């Protein structure tokens, strides 16, 4: 704990990364955040699959019971993809020098972009195996995903990781783990709001007011575009992370971060999904097809 006085809002002393110790086992907010997020996506998807009028041809693309079969695969793919993304893309030198640190996911260190790749592979595999339209499968998962992202970002705040740049704004926070104990943007909470709860509201409105699920790929396309934009904005307020050396050499002092660079392919993917959604003639006349 830093002994210096805080010129802004002091980090709440009651917040601890560990919820409770059960003998030698510790329950972490970070791990619980992932569990709650995945369970919310499962619950919300089941609710929407019951509402036939939301879907193209008034026919949900899958039985609501099947989404439960995907929960385990989604959890595994997110954790494995997210951790591999962190290890291979963000800090390979450290993790290869400290291989035991690779499995300590409860301490944080999960790449959203890696998790997205992991669950995308799982969704494509599951959709093909169960004869589900791939873009519809993307929509089913994407529609509730922002809540999970928002919860995990709050857990980042509790873990005192990914804090923001130094600022004089009155809502600045002093993090005890910051060696300089300076007032900083609570960028984790900015991300929780933009990437999480605000994006969820946008998808909610698109789903219920504009019936976006009737064109498979629309919801997932907007989700990916929305996340990429929100992440790029939040990168402005985040304290710089240690980017790969080759990237730092190319973009030194430009303000263009590695997180922004990783979000660029997401923009292209999101617009591609939207293009496919509105090009697909089968969603105009009510007929469905299983190929993408």
UniProtKB/Swiss-Prot annotation:
Which sites bind a 1,2-diacyl-sn-glycero-3-phospho-(1'-sn-glycerol)?
A: 153
Alphabetized, the UniProt keywords read: Cell inner membrane, Cell membrane, Membrane, Transferase, Transmembrane, Transmembrane helix
State the membrane topology: Multi-pass membrane protein
Q: Which GO terms describe its biological process?
A: lipoprotein biosynthetic process
Broad class of where this protein is predominantly found: membrane
Q: Which GO terms describe its molecular function?
A: phosphatidylglycerol-prolipoprotein diacylglyceryl transferase activity
Q: Where in the cell is it found?
A: Cell inner membrane
Pfam families on file: LGT
Kindly list the GO CC terms recorded for this protein: plasma membrane
Q: What class of enzyme is it?
A: transferase
Residue ranges crossing the lipid bilayer per the database entry: 25-45, 70-90, 138-158, 193-213, 217-237, 255-275
Q: Pathway membership of this protein? A: Protein modification; lipoprotein biosynthesis (diacylglyceryl transfer)
Q: What is its EC number?
A: 2.5.1.145
Per the record, the similarity remark reads:
Belongs to the Lgt family.
Q: What is the documented function of this protein?
A: Catalyzes the transfer of the diacylglyceryl group from phosphatidylglycerol to the sulfhydryl group of the N-terminal cysteine of a prolipoprotein, the first step in the formation of mature lipoproteins.
| Name of this protein | Phosphatidylglycerol--prolipoprotein diacylglyceryl transferase
Q: What is the lineage of its organism?
A: Bacteria, Pseudomonadati, Pseudomonadota, Alphaproteobacteria, Hyphomicrobiales
Q: Name the gene for this chain.
A: lgt
């Amino acid at each position: 704990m830093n002994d210096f006085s805080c010129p802004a809002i002091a980090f709440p002393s009651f917040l601890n990364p560990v919820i409770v110790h059960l003998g030698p086992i510790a329950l972490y907010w970070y791990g619980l955040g992932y569990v709650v997020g995945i369970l919310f996506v499962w619950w919300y998807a089941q609710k929407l699959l019951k509402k036939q009028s939301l879907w193209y041809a008034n026919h949900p693309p899958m039985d609501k019971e099947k989404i439960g079969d995907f929960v385990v695969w989604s959890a595994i793919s997110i954790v494995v993809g997210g951790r591999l993304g962190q290890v291979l893309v963000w800090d390979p030198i450290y993790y290869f020098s400290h291989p035991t640190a690779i499995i300590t996911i409860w301490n944080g260190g999960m790449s959203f972009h890696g998790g997205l790749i992991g669950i995308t592979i799982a969704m494509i595999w599951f959709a093909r195996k169960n004869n589900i339209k791939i873009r519809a499968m993307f929509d089913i998962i994407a529609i509730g995903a922002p809540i999970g992202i928002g919860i995990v970002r709050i857990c980042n705040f509790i873990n005192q990781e990914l804090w923001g740049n130094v600022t004089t704004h009155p809502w600045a926070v002093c993090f005890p783990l910051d060696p300089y104990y300076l007032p900083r943007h609570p960028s984790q909470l900015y991300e929780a709001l933009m990437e999480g709860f605000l994006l969820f509201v946008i998808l909610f409105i698109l789903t219920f007011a504009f019936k976006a699920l009737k064109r498979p790929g629309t919801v997932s396309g907007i989700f990916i575009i929305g996340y990429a934009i929100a992440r790029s904005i939040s990168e402005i307020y985040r304290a710089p992370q240690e980017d790969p050396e080759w990237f730092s050499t190319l973009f030194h002092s430009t303000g263009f971060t590695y997180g922004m660079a990783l979000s660029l392919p997401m923009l292209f993917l999101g617009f591609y999904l939207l293009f496919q959604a509105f090009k697909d003639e089968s969603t105009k006349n009510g007929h469905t097809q299983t190929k993408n």
